[in-house]
Amino acid sequence: MSIDRTSPLKPVSTVQTRETSDTPVQKTRQEKTSAATSASVTLSDAQAKLMQPGVSDINMERVEALKTAIRNGELKMDTGKIADSLIREAQSYLQSK
């Protein structure tokens, strides 16, 4: 099937410039800023502990050991165990629906 062009393409003759006024944008930003400064946030103890620098629930030594084992081709995985867990999770999910 062939599609023939019925009329030639014409370029846009002129592009009209859009006049922008910064005052509405600035006014909106000022309103948002004033609303944001009046908010108060209180963190729970658990959240506060997570926000502290240097606190991590990730064992970086274990992560590095796993990376090294993967890189060296030494990581052994029990695919049967993984498959069984996936099936168990899927069954649990479907039963909860």
Swiss-Prot record:
Q: What is its main location?
A: cytoplasm
> For the region Disordered, what residue ranges are annotated?
1-40
Q: Name one GO molecular function term.
A: molecular function inhibitor activity
Kindly indicate whether the keyword Amino-acid biosynthesis belongs to this entry. Answer: no
**Keyword entries, A-Z:** Bacterial flagellum biogenesis, Cytoplasm, Repressor, Transcription, Transcription regulation
Q: Which residue stretches, if any, does this entry annotate as coiled coil?
A: none
Q: Where in the cell is it found?
A: Cytoplasm
Set out the biological process GO terms recorded for this chain's protein.
Answer: bacterial-type flagellum organization; negative regulation of DNA-templated transcription
Q: What are its GO cellular component terms?
A: cytoplasm
Q: Which InterPro entries match?
A: Anti-sigma-28_factor_FlgM_sf, FlgM, FlgM_C
Is Transcription among the key words of this record? yes
Q: Where is the composition biased (Polar residues)?
A: 13-27
Q: Which family does the record assign?
A: Belongs to the FlgM family.
In the record's own words, the domains note is: The N-terminal domain is essential for export and the C-terminal domain possess the FliA binding site.
The record describes the protein's role as:
Responsible for the coupling of flagellin expression to flagellar assembly by preventing expression of the flagellin genes when a component of the middle class of proteins is defective. It negatively regulates flagellar genes by inhibiting the activity of FliA by directly binding to FliA.
Protein name from the UniProt record: Negative regulator of flagellin synthesis
Q: Which organism is it from?
A: Salmonella typhimurium (strain LT2 / SGSC1412 / ATCC 700720)
